[in-house]
Design a protein with these regions (language model features):
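Conserved hydrophobic beta-strand within the GNAT/NAT acetyltransferase core sheet
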Residues: 166, 199-203
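Conserved acetyl-CoA-binding loop-helix of GNAT-fold acetyltransferases
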Residues: 53-59, 177-194, 211-216
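Conserved active-site alpha-helix within GNAT-family acetyltransferase domains
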Residues: 77-82, 182, 205-224, 231
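A conserved beta-strand-loop-helix scaffold within acyl/acetyltransferase catalytic domains
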Residues: 130-140, 144-172
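A short beta-loop-alpha structural element at the N-terminal edge
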Residues: 107-118
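A short, internal acetyl-CoA/4′-phosphopantetheine-binding micro-motif in the GNAT/acyltransferase core
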Residues: 45-51, 169-176, 204
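Acyl-donor-binding surface of acyltransferase catalytic domains
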Residues: 2-103
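Extended, positively charged loop/linker patches that create polyanion-binding surfaces
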Residues: 106-107, 122-135
C-alpha cells in the first residue's frame, strides 16, 4: 500500500485541527479560528494555516493564563510574551502494509475506565508522550497484562478524516524484548484497517528503536515534523 498527496493526505498536515473539527469536537473547545482539547484529555492546540496575531490572542483566551499549548508542526512564531517550553524533532509515519498486519494479538485486552490508574502509572514509568486522565476517551486502548499487572499498552489518539493515529506505545522496562509493542501496534492497525481507515503515527526522531520497529511493522515516513510547546502569557 502506497500513498500520494492525492490520497487524502492533506488532513495529516493539521491532524489536531482536523480531529477537533470532526471526531473529537465533543472533547475540545473552540474560540475564533483556534481550537484545543479539554485539559484533562490532551494539551494539543490548533491554529489556522494563515495564522494572525488575533489567532494567538484567541488561543490565549481559550487556554487561560500560564497554560500549556502543545503544537504539531506549527511553523508560525508566537508573540514574544508566549514562553517557549520545548522543541522536539520527529516523524510522521503512515501504514504502507497490506489490509492486515498479520500480528499475533494473543494476550491483548481492551482497556477501559477502570484501568486508567494503571495506565497513568505505566505512562509515568515509561514516558512515551503526553497522557492525561481522560486521554483514553480519544479512542480504543489496548494492553497486555503479566500476572495481572499492566505491562504494555498502546491506543488511538488523533482522528483526522479517514485516519487514526496510534500512540502511547509503551512497555514496562522489565518485560521489554518480548514483542509486546509489536503485538499492540499490529492489533490496533488491524482494527483501524477493518473499519476502512488508515493508521498513522508520530515518533521522536531520536527514538531510533521505535522507528525501526514501526518500519518492520509496515510504516513508512511521510515527512519530518517539529513539535513545539509554549506557555501562554
Amino acid at each position: 500500500m502506497t500513498y500520494d498527496e492525492g490520497d487524502g493526505l492533506a488532513v495529516l498536515d493539521d491532524p489536531v485541527g482536523e480531529s477537533l473539527r470532526g471526531r473529537h469536537a465533543g472533547l475540545g473547545r473552540r474560540h475564533g479560528r483556534t481550537a484545543t482539547y479539554l485539559p484533562e484529555v490532551a494539551t494539543f492546540s490548533a491554529l489556522p494555516a494563515d495564522v494572525e496575531a488575533a489567532d494567538w490572542a484567541d488561543l490565549a483566551r481559550l487556554l487561560g493564563r500560564d497554560a500549556f499549548a502543545d503544537m504539531f508542526s506549527c511553523a508560525a512564531v508566537p508573540p514574544p510574551d508566549w514562553e517557549p517550553v520545548f522543541v522536539l524533532e520527529g516523524r510522521q509515519m503512515l501504514w504502507s502494509g497490506g489490509g492486515t498486519s498479520g500480528a499475533d494479538d494473543a494476550g491483548v485486552v481492551e482497556l477501559g475506565a477502570a484501568d486508567v490508574p494503571e495506565m497513568l502509572d505505566l505512562i509515568a514509568r515509561t514516558q512515551p508522550g503526553p497522557f492525561w486522565p481522560r486521554t483514553r476517551e480519544l479512542g480504543t486502548y489496548l494492553g497486555i497484562r503479566d500476572g495481572g499487572r499492566l505491562v504494555a499498552m498502546a491506543g488511538e489518539r488523533l482522528r483526522p478524516p479517514g485516519w487514526t493515529e496510534i500512540s502511547a506505545v509503551c512497555t514496562d522496562p522489565e518485560v521489554r524484548g518480548r514483542g509486546h509493542a509489536a503485538r499492540l501496534v499490529g492489533a490496533l492497525a488491524d482494527r483501524v484497517l477493518a473499519r476502512g481507515e488508515r493508521p498513522f503515527l508520530h515518533v521522536a526522531e531520536k527514538n531510533a528503536a521505535a522507528i525501526a520497529l514501526y518500519e518492520r511493522l509496515g510504516f513508512t515516513t511521510r515527512k519530518h515534523v517539529t513539535f513545539r510547546g509554549f506557555r501562554t502569557p
